[in-house]
Design a protein with these regions (language model features):
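Non-cysteine beta-strand/loop elements that form the S-adenosyl-L-methionine
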Residues: 1, 26, 58-69
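Conserved non-cysteine loop/helix-boundary elements of the Radical SAM core domain that shape
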Residues: 1-25, 35-56, 74-86, 90
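An N-terminal domain-start capping segment
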Residues: 16-27, 116-120, 126
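A cross-domain feature marking catalytic cores of carbohydrate-active enzymes
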Residues: 30-34, 63-65, 111-113
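Auxiliary Fe-S-binding modules of radical SAM enzymes
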Residues: 54, 60, 68-201
Length: 201
C-alpha cells in the first residue's frame, strides 16, 4: 500500500519511527486514508493500518478520506483504468474494518475533516470502539434512499448527521430530493459527490 501511493517508507519503518516518537514522550498522530488503495486493496489498506496502530498505539488516529481530485495525476490514472476508486460507502466500510482490527490501544480516533462522510465517528479506541462501530453500522443499515440523501447533504457541507436532515432549509431539502431522485446511476452519483468534494481538497 505504501509503495502504491509513493509514501517513501515501509510499514516496518513507520512502526519503528512511531514507537521512537512515543518513547520520547512526543504526541503522535497516525493518519488513515480510507480508499487510498482503491477497490483492489480496500481490505488490505484497513488491516495494514490497524496493524501499525496496534504496534504503535498513537495518541490520535485521524481520518482523511481519500478523494481523487479532478485534473490531478491520480485522476489521469483513474481514467486510464489503472486505479478504480472506492465508493463513498466502501470507504466507510474500510473505516469499519480498520476499527474491528484495532486491539489494546487507548488513543483517540478523530473524524476531524469535512471530507469524511461521518463526522461523528470520534472516541477513545479502548472505551468507545463499540459505540463507534454501532454508529457506523446504524448508517449502513439505513434505507439506501436515506443514505443517498445524507451523502449529498454532507458533500454539500452539512455538518449534522442523517437524523438532522429535516433541519436543512426547504431550498436545500428540495435540491437534495431532486438529486436523489434524478441521479440513479451509481457511477454518476459518485461523480456528483466527487464534484462537491473537489471544493475541499
Amino acid at each position: 500500500m505504501l509503495q502504491l501511493i509513493g509514501k517513501g517508507t515501509t510499514q516496518k519503518q513507520q512502526i519503528e519511527g512511531g514507537q521512537k516518537v512515543k518513547k520520547a514522550g512526543i504526541e503522535l498522530s497516525i493518519y488513515f486514508m480510507p480508499g487510498a488503495g482503491g477497490k483492489q486493496y480496500t481490505e488490505k489498506n484497513a488491516i495494514d493500518t490497524a496493524n501499525v496502530i496496534n504496534a504503535v498505539n498513537p495518541d490520535f488516529v485521524r481520518l482523511r478520506t481519500f478523494v481523487v481530485k479532478s485534473d490531478s495525476l491520480m485522476y489521469d490514472i483513474v481514467k486510464s483504468g489503472e486505479f478504480t476508486e472506492c465508493s463513498d460507502i466502501e470507504k466507510l466500510l474500510e473505516i469499519k474494518i480498520m476499527l474491528e482490527h484495532i486491539q489494546n490501544c487507548n488513543g483517540y480516533l478523530a473524524s476531524d475533516h469535512i471530507i469524511n462522510l461521518l463526522q461523528n465517528v470520534n472516541g477513545y479506541l479502548d472505551k468507545d470502539k463499540n459505540a463507534m462501530l454501532d454508529y457506523i453500522n446504524t448508517f449502513l443499515a439505513l434505507p439506501r434512499k436515506t443514505q443517498r440523501k445524507y451523502q449529498i447533504a454532507r458533500r454539500m457541507g452539512f455538518a449534522g448527521d442523517w437524523t438532522m436532515l429535516d433541519k436543512l432549509s426547504m431550498h436545500y431539502q428540495y435540491i437534495i430530493e431532486q438529486y436523489e431522485k434524478n441521479v440513479s446511476d451509481g457511477k454518476q452519483f459518485e461523480k456528483l459527490l466527487n464534484q462537491y468534494m473537489d471544493n475541499y481538497i
